[in-house]
């Protein structure tokens, strides 16, 4: 209920629901999955649960292997999503390389609508690295809370308009999503909209 209220509040518009709350039996498998280490079919299927649904619900997924997008899109359509955006992201995430060209594929109703080559430079992103690097000081760290705080601080800084690779990653991904949802006719214009929101501080309100 609290999550729904936050989503419906136009001043907030988002919420997070932990898997332990919306599907505890699946969450209880975490210790076993940690022992398996490798990705399982659950990694593919669990994002499709979508505990909060609207009249239109969209799925944003990252992929690595070229054969995956139509499979993911079909699964999303069967799971009731209005559309899906498949982004060839770093390590299978939804943030593309900040250094080189990439690809995104837009599906509506499980049908491919657009297949777009994306270039970070066209969105004003010029980076020597493909993604933010993992700090060496955390490589052997056992206290995950410190790492979590580090990431949260980076995210909050970027959402407050502080420039850097985290900021660029937000601009890039959000621009692709805005374009996919037809909130902007072009990617450069979408990037301007995202930067305006970040730089104004509204994104962190």
Language model features with spans:
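Glycine/threonine-rich beta-strand-loop-alpha-helix active-site module
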Residues: 1-6
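Glycine-rich anion-binding loops and their surrounding alpha/beta cores
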Residues: 8-205
């Amino acid at each position: 209920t609290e999550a729904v209220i936050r989503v419906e509040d136009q001043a907030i518009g988002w919420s997070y629901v932990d898997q332990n709350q919306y599907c505890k039996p699946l969450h209880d498998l975490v210790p076993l999955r940690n022992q398996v280490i490798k990705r399982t079919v659950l990694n593919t299927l669990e994002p499709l649960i979508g505990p909060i649904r609207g009249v239109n619900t969209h799925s944003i997924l990252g992929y690595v292997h070229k054969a995956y997008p139509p499979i993911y899109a079909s699964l999303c359509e069967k799971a009731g999503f209005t559309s899906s955006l498949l982004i060839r992201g770093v390590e299978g995430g939804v943030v593309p390389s900040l250094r080189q060209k990439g690809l995104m594929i837009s599906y509506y109703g499980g049908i491919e609508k657009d297949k777009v080559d994306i270039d970070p430079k066209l969105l004003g992103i010029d980076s020597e690295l493909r993604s933010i690097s993992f700090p060496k000081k955390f490589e052997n760290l056992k206290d995950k809370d410190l790492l979590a705080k580090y990431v949260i601080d980076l995210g909050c800084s970027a959402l407050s308009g502080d420039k850097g690779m985290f900021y660029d990653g937000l601009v890039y991904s959000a621009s692709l999503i805005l374009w996919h949802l037809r909130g902007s006719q072009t990617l450069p214009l979408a990037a301007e909209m995202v930067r305006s929101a970040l730089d104004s501080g509204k994104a962190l309100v």
